[in-house]
C-alpha cells in the first residue's frame, strides 16, 4: 500500500512535538446548562465514563450536547497501555450486577438515541466480560427499544466464543480499535497484538456480514505515512467499514510522549486514502473512536442511502 492514487495530493508535514500545542489543537471549552445536566445525571447514577477516566479532550463538547460514553465492567483495567489514563489494577473488583440498570437509567434520562459503551479490559474473567456486556445491552434494548447501541470492546484475548456472545446481543456497531500501526503496537499496547485485533475484526465480519464494524487509530506516535496507509488497507481487508483517526495527546508525562502534531490537511489526506479503499473515515485532530458517534452513524447511513439511489 505504498502507492497513492494520483488524485490524492499529499499534504505538508505536521509539526514535531513540543509542549506548546499548535493552533489547530486549541479549542474553547463550552459549558452551560446542558453540560451541567449531563454531569449531574452521570454522577447521580454512579456510572463511570471513558470521558472522565481517560481524560478525553472532548468531554465538555460531548456533554454539552448531552452525549457520553459509558465505561463498563468497572473503572480499573487489567492492562496498562502506554497511551491510556484509565487506572490499572492487578485485581479488578467483581463486575457490578447493578451496572445494566445504572447505564439504562442514565441513558433514559439523557434521552440517548445512540448509546455508546466501552469497557476496561477484563483479562481476569473467563469470557473477558462478554456475558456482563450482554446483560447491559439486553437491558438497554428493553428500556430504550428505539435506541441503537455501539460497543467498543477489548480483544477478549482472541476468544472468539466471547466475541460471538457479544455479537449475539443485537449491536448496531461493533468497534474494536487497533489503536496504532503494527510496528508501534508492542510499545503502545503491550498486552495486545496488531494481528490479533485484525483477527477479531475479521471474525466479527464473518459471523455477522451485515454488522457495521468500526476501528480506530491514533496518529502522532511516530508512525510513517506509509504505515497509516497500510493500516487502512489492513482494516478494509478484514471487514472494517468505519474508521476513526485522531491525534494522540498524552494524558500526563508518565505516558508515551507525542512525537508529532498531525495537521488537519494530513487528516483530510488520510480520510481520502481510506475512502479510496471503500472505508467511511472520520478523521481530525480531536476525533476519538466514540466522538460524535451518533453523527458518524447517521452520516454513513445517509451516504449509503445516496449511493443506493445512484
Swiss-Prot record:
Gene designation: lipA
UniProt cofactor(s): [4Fe-4S] cluster
Pfam families: Radical_SAM
Known catalytic reactions: [[Fe-S] cluster scaffold protein carrying a second [4Fe-4S](2+) cluster] + N(6)-octanoyl-L-lysyl-[protein] + 2 oxidized [2Fe-2S]-[ferredoxin] + 2 S-adenosyl-L-methionine + 4 H(+) = [[Fe-S] cluster scaffold protein] + N(6)-[(R)-dihydrolipoyl]-L-lysyl-[protein] + 4 Fe(3+) + 2 hydrogen sulfide + 2 5'-deoxyadenosine + 2 L-methionine + 2 reduced [2Fe-2S]-[ferredoxin]
GO molecular function: 4 iron, 4 sulfur cluster binding; lipoate synthase activity; metal ion binding
Binding-site residues, [4Fe-4S] cluster 2: 77, 81, 84
Keyword tags: 4Fe-4S, Cytoplasm, Iron, Iron-sulfur, Metal-binding, S-adenosyl-L-methionine, Transferase
Identification of the protein by name: Lipoyl synthase
Record keyword Transferase present: yes
